[in-house]
Amino acid sequence: FTWADGNGITDLAAVPNVFAGGSWINILDPAYGLPTVRINEFLASNVNTNGLRDEFGNLDDWIELYNYGANPVDLNGCALTDDASVPGKWVFPSVTLAPNQYLVVFASGLDRKIVGGTNKLHTSFSLSTGGEYLGLYNAESPRVAMDEFAPTYPEQRDDYSYGRDPANALRYFSVPTPGAANG
């Protein structure tokens, strides 16, 4: 926030929200933190005919999220991006992840946010096999990275996923496990 005598408060959002002057009380919650969701695994070159397919039968790239916390997390307004300068590139609809739940989002470029039935989530971008930035951002303004592969993730291999093992170390997986624990 910026403060100006007699002029109220203006936040630092891209389109500023101006609040009228008057009496204000600002309370910070010391228990507040970022949501407990991370990018757990992704596959940037899904070419094997036995690989995970979307609802159209396509072998698209995919990103797996995992809620490692003890409470459900609503992803509404959170975002995935392949460009650190555009943290809100693809914004989630209201989708809640229960504790220890996984969510697979296809990185197909189709930009689909309708869930239910056979509909799956699809980002507005696909993943580069040569390595690029990949980030998950909170819904607040300004956006803060909840998890990211920065400055870039390493070069990817056909049908090998990349992500966190049970010890939280980053590595390749010859047997991808979308929607399940990594081995």
Question: Language-model segments: what does each one mean?
Answer:
Residues 1-183:
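Intrinsically disordered, low-complexity linkers and terminal tails enriched in Ser/Thr/Pro/Gly
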